[in-house]
Amino acid sequence: MSSGGLLLLLGLLTLWAELTPVSGRPGLCELPAETGPCKARIRAFYYNPHSHKCLEFTYGGCKGNANNFKTIDECNRTCVG
């Protein structure tokens, strides 16, 4: 293989490695915190993919999304590992 072909192959492998997810974290952990439209004030936890931590938020009690955990331990087990 020519040196140009090897460089192209190396570049493609590098791009593939950069775009392939590293963790086995479930997709729900990538969702934003969603309070929902209801007015209850329920203490809940969500995974913040930018800080790589589970954080507290106030859940309204309805709708929202799956990135919503009753305890920080449950959030950590699911999303942090």
UniProtKB/Swiss-Prot annotation:
Residues 1-24 form the signal peptide. Its main location: secreted. Expressed by the venom gland. It comes from the Eukaryota. Keywords: Disulfide bond, Protease inhibitor, Secreted, Serine protease inhibitor, Signal, Toxin. The keyword Magnesium does not apply. GO terms for molecular function: serine-type endopeptidase inhibitor activity; toxin activity. Residues 29-79 form the BPTI/Kunitz inhibitor domain. The keyword Secreted applies. This is Protease inhibitor 1.
